[in-house]
Structures are given as C-alpha cells and as structure tokens.
Amino acid sequence: MRKILPLRAWLAAGLILGSPFSHAASNLVFCSEGSPAGFDPAQYTTGTDYDATSVTLFNRLVQFERGGTRAIPALAESWDIGDDGKTYTFHLRKGVKFHSTDYFKPTREFNADDVLFTFERMLDKNHPFRKAYPTEFPYFTDMGLDKNIARVEKLDEHRVKFTLNEVDAAFIQNLAMDVASIQSAEYAGQLLEAGKPQQINQKPIGTGPFILSRYQKDAQIRFKGNKDYWKPEDVKIDNLIFSINTDAAVRAQKLKAGECQITLNPRPADLKALQEAANLKVPSQPGFNLGYIAYNVTHKPFDQLEVRQALDMAVNKQAIIDAVYQGAGQLAVNGMPPTQWSYDETIKDAPFDPAKARELLKKAGVAEGTEITLWAMPVQRPYNPNAKLMAEMIQADWAKIGIKARIVSYEWGEYIKRAHAGEHDAMLFGWTGDNGDPDNWLATLYGCDSINGNNVSKWCDAAYDKLVKAAKRVSDQDKRSELYKQAQHILKEQVPITPIAHSTVYQPMNKSVHDFKISPFSRNAFYGVTNQP
C-alpha cells in the first residue's frame, strides 16, 4: 500500500500552494466538508458525493454551463427531438478519451456503447453488471427516469436514440444531472471479467477534467489534471486536492492560514473575519435551496395530520433564522425556493402558536411526554449552517408542547442511507436545486416515486402526485406553473414537512483563485479555474 502523506507534509515539501518556489499556479487545495460515500455518482444523491465524482471525474451527454442553469452540449455535440416529443437522438462527440490509470488502459475512445451501458445498467435490474454488483440508483428512480425511458438504442458508433413512454419537459435538464454521468463500458467489462464489478465505485474511470490519483477517507482526495481532456482549455490545474474536515471553524482557519485556497459553507459566526481577511474574498449569492424538517408519515404519531400541524406551528422559525442563519437566511414557506419559477406566493405559513399546537395534540390523542427521534445532520450544508443548534432549538420548542425529542446523528453517508430506509421519526433535511426545474423539487422530494429515496417524509398523496406528473408532460410553462401551484397547496395543507429557511450561499476563497463560479446547484467545479498567487 502506498503511503498517503498528510496535507501538512505536502505543504512542507512545497508540493502544494504556499511556497514561493513551487509552481503554485497549477495546484489548488479545496477544504471540503466530508468524504464521498463512493465514486459512482449514479448511486448517490448529495453534493459532497458529486463534487468528488460527477463534477470532477465525469461528463454527461449535456451539462449545465459552469455557474448557470442552462444545459449545453458536452459528450453529445447536438441532439434532435422527434415531433411527438418522445424521441431524442444524440450526436456524440468524437475524439473523447477515457482516463488512463494504473488500473485501466482504454483501447478505444468514447462511443455509443458507453451511453448504452450507463443507462441500461440503471434501467434493467437483470443487466449482467447490475446482477454481479447489485445496487440501487435512488435519484434516477426519484425522477421517474426508470419508468419513462422506454429504450436506448445505438444507431451507430456516434449516435444514440432515447425513446420515452411519455413527454418529459425536463428531459434534457435531467440528462445534465450528476446521475447521468457516462461510464466506460470497456472498463465495466474488464471489471466483470475479473470478478470485481464493485471497483466501479472505488476506482472510477470517466472522461472528466480530472483523474483520481489517491484517496484517504476523511483525510484527502488527490486528483491530477487530465492532459487528454476533450476541452483542454478547461484544465488549468495540475494537482487538485480535497482536504476533508467536517468542522467549518477548522476549514475557515485553514483557509486564512493558506493551507487551502477555497472552502464552502462557512459558519455565520466566521463570516466577518473571513470577509475582513486581506488575502481572501467571499463572493455570495441567494441560495437556490431549502432547509426543512421532514416528518416520516409511516411512523406513529406522524401519520396523523393534526400531529404534523401541531409540530409545525410549535417551531419558532424566526428564532432559528436569527440564531442559526444569523441574518443570512430567509424564512421558508413552501417546498421550494421563491426564485424557482411556478412558486406560489399566495400560500401563507401557519402562525407560530404553541397553545393551538397543544390543542391539536390533545385532539389527536397524543399523550404528554410522548418520545420521538429528531435526526440532525453531522455536517454543514448550504441550506443548514448548524444542524446541531437547529435541532436543539426545535427540541426545546417541542418540549413546550409536551413532545420529548431525542436528537440522533450519524456520519453523513450513513445519515442519508438510513433516511432513505425510513428509520427516522422526524429529521432535518434539505435540498439545493439540481436542474432549475420545479419537478426537481416537487417530484424528487415529495413525489410517490421518491419514497424510497429523497422523499424522506415517505408521504404519498394521489391527488398531489397526479398534478406533479401531469405538469411534467406539458411543454407550455404557464400551464405547468398552474399545475405546480395546485400541488403546492396540497403540500402545504398536508404538512409532510416544515419549511425552515432558504440560505444565502457564501464561497470564501483566496484572492489568488480566478474564474471560480458559484453554482446555483451548490456544486464545486474546478475546471476552468486558475490559482495564481
């Protein structure tokens, strides 16, 4: 086993930024907040996973422009949509090379076979690779792509055709998402033949701007620039290092000390010092996000509407905004942010009313002192800068109405895994939009198809689901908006969640970092970025 030196050793050796004698402009250290659960992006749902995989190592047929929401050509140079809106023919880019590593040497360039493998593995539970390495693809399923993609066909080496069962107004946007990252069919075949298919999640091969070099869980991930990248002007960093630390205060100190050049999700308490540091800049933008409490409606007493209403109106949201977000948050009312088109501004929040909450609990037959669990995420997220404090404040609010909440936390990957399995009673959860479409909120987080994935409330309402699915099949945006607004009213009335806040996103970095663009989807992309002290 090769020894992985701690970050300080690399710094001392002058191999990373900080030494005037190193070729610093070609190296960059990112103070990351957590370890990825794995390196196969199709298996995961969080930004922590995607930063280390889909954004860095992989490409998709189409991708979102850096810092924006527009889907642009990537591994597909162009595409044609059939008159019925159900067929999409993609014309693939030629000359694209897969990563060459010590564990895989490609013998051919990217072609249609790779697209087929990528999607057939997710569509067909009897696919040979999936049978050898059984896994689930929760986000792919949450979006309903497993049901709506009827087939994927290879027309020739550089053309593939997707046929849908129903019109999907968000299909191109969905193909730009992380779960649609293109894998190497040749590499998968090699792993299958060797009896090691699980290595697709440990030793990744993509076509992206960086290549995985080394990984030490909870310590660092090292990438090297892909010199064979199909868009060479985007690879301006020779060595990209993710220095992992779950403590935001430590990340801030490392940034100020020059041990890393960029970080994410600073604590509100650290913002002023970061903004005043002479060597730093702290760009910001309104967050396309939502932090909320999810109630598991499959657990008693959360199956009763009166109980959910009571817990909702017992939470002092303004106090949370003041203490947790410290002025960098906006009170949330709906299940998506107000910057999302189709947001219904007519919907009002329930008033903060502990006395009425007690009455509702009594009506529901919930005894004084009833015990429940309240899960709190162990890491900072763009939508929740301090989950521990938020959970403690909610715990205190619920205690005032006779509910005893026991706070539970797990390592981030385990937290998500157990949430998908529905082990919680109530939990702090949140979302940053992934594609700019309302479906990414209203279906992915609250739809019936998502109850085994990101719908951690496990709430399935037939009337709501009918509206959301109908909206996806309509191309006219005004008509879609009307359907989505009706769905938002049902969501608010049924209270599977308590929306808490939309946060402002801050991205502290050294002034030496240039051309980094804050993503509306909270991705951290380092292609096209330079570091010039």
Curated annotation (Swiss-Prot):
InterPro entries: Peptide/Ni-bd, SBP_5, SBP_5_CS, SBP_5_dom. CDD domains: PBP2_DppA_like. GO terms for biological process: dipeptide transport; protein transport. Keywords: Peptide transport, Protein transport, Signal, Transport. One of its GO terms (cellular component) is ATP-binding cassette (ABC) transporter complex. Residues 1-24 form the signal peptide. It comes from the Bacteria. It holds the Pfam family SBP_bac_5. GO terms for molecular function: peptide transmembrane transporter activity. The keyword tRNA-binding does not apply. Part of the ABC transporter DppABCDF involved in the uptake of various di/tripeptides. Prefers dipeptides with acidic residues at the C-terminal end. Involved in the uptake of phaseolotoxin, a toxic tripeptide inhibiting the enzyme ornithine carbamoyltransferase. Belongs to the bacterial solute-binding protein 5 family. The complex is composed of two ATP-binding proteins (DppD and DppF), two transmembrane proteins (DppB and DppC) and a solute-binding protein (DppA3). Five orthologous SBPs (DppA1-A5) are present in P.aeruginosa, which increases the substrate specificity of the DppBCDF transporter. This is Di/tripeptide-binding protein 3. It comes from Pseudomonas aeruginosa (strain UCBPP-PA14). The gene is dppA3.
